[in-house]
Amino acid sequence: MVLFGADGRYLFVWADVEARMKKNYNMHCMPMVVLLNLGEDALVVRRQGYEGVPQNTGLPEWLTDGERGKVMRTLIKHGLIVDPASHVHSKNNLLVEDGRIQGLTAEEPEADVILDAEGMVVSPGFVDIHMHEDPYDPEEGRLIPSIMTSMLRMGVTTAIGGNCGINTVSPLRYLELMDRDGGPINMGLLAGHTFLREQAGHRDKYSAIRPDEQQRLSRLVKEALEAGCFGVSFGIRYVPGVTRDEMVKTACFCQSHGRLVATHVRDDADNVFDAVEELVSIGRQLDLPGQVSHVGSMGGFGQMERLLALIDRYRASGMELSGDCYPYDAFSTRIGETTYDEGFLERYCTQYSAIEICEGMYKGQRCTERLFHELRQTAPDTLTVCHVMKAEDVALALSHPAIMLASDGLMDRGQGHPRGAGAFPRLLCRYVAAGKMNLDDAVAKMSAMPAQKLGLTRKGTLRKGADADIVIFDMDRIRDCATFEHPDRPPEGIEWVLIGGKIAVEHGTVKQSSLGRAIRA
């Protein structure tokens, strides 16, 4: 005997029902065919033990372990629910079922898992719109999670890599690996212009692209967008040979797909205004939304007030323009990048000693002129931190209504800038707890704003039907613990993190590290 049971897009096929009807089949049935995915684009059948079907079957995460067929219910009780997208700020209970938010309730219904959030804040899982994804190991054929784990520990449940024009591997391959293996958090990508430019055959960052290379680049960008990338990212500061024409011919594919253009603009400090104008002019020409990447490190040298006023004027004229910022007054990049080309000391009004080495035999040391030039020649990929930004400019950016929080996290085997492990709790403890920002605005900058910018309607909110990606934190204890000496040290005060309704972090400890999946535009 076979029983069919529909659940939205999924059709479950159960066998051996007669032997089990004495019990609740939702709790005990073993599926012969796990499911038929009746989504808009595909029909996928997955059988127990059949290796011929691809690993990615569109399964909701709650169906991927020994609880197949069981309706999982989680109750988060007595917490302060903060959901800016729904204008909710109240003490209540939150019910989760089958990986989705079922709603708020004053009751305490029975549940498989009950989390007591008394005295804590319950918010949507944080969304990081600007980070740099983990590397790919070609020998093992898998991703090497490092920064994704740090993200999870600080409450990030969804992040976007591929920023500043950089991908670590083909976007198509990366998303396939996330589908196959999962990861600590949900991951989406931007198509990195610089990466794809090199794949198209042009590796000289100081020269213009040739017409045949532009054709190959255009094809690669189109393929990446069709595969689900959320838009195109540019790192023009790192590739000064890129012309405005190349940017237009690359970004134009976002127009037909309705995607985002995120840009590490061409210049910073006193030249940042013309650089932002370039992004805006392209956005207007193509009618595309723009995102100014890490505004703190672009105008955080005394130009921030004027830069934010410029952004306001563009927005008032109808341009969809926003930005992101991390709550630190030091930026990070590799020592061989164009950021450190001749003239940088004068541009930042600084000295070589402002540069701190993040890895290798000189880790923790400040640069001298000799060491700087030695590493530029012999180890150009060495990660550095440059302590040159003005704290007051960073604070000004973070308080602006069009600027959302992002980590710009970049790590190499746990080494790098502490923002990759501390940016989100740092905003809570150093801005909210310190009275510089209200809680709702901070949570919005960490969840609703980036989710809305990306078009992720089921992320960044706790409304009914949303994905149950949730972070529960203690405002009395929340603090970032990552330092420049120990950049991957996890924060305190993050009590639980749920992804798809399942507990990924409990009392600061990672319990499940593969609940995340690829997300696509």
Positions of predicted regions on the chain:
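Divalent-metal coordination cores built from histidine and acidic residues
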Residues: 131, 136-233, 319, 328
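Hydrophobic faces of well-ordered beta-strands that scaffold small-molecule active sites
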Residues: 127-129, 159-161, 187-189, 232-234, ...
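C-terminal cap of metal-dependent C-N hydrolases
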Residues: 388, 395-402, 407-408, 423, ...
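Acidic, glycine-enriched loop/beta-strand segments at the rims
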Residues: 82-93, 384-388, 438-443, 451-488
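Divalent metal-binding pocket/active-site signature
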Residues: 223-279
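Active-site neighborhoods of metal-dependent hydrolases
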Residues: 203-211, 217-230, 234, 293-436
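N-terminal metal-binding scaffold of metallo-dependent hydrolase/deaminase domains
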Residues: 9, 55-57, 61-109, 442, ...
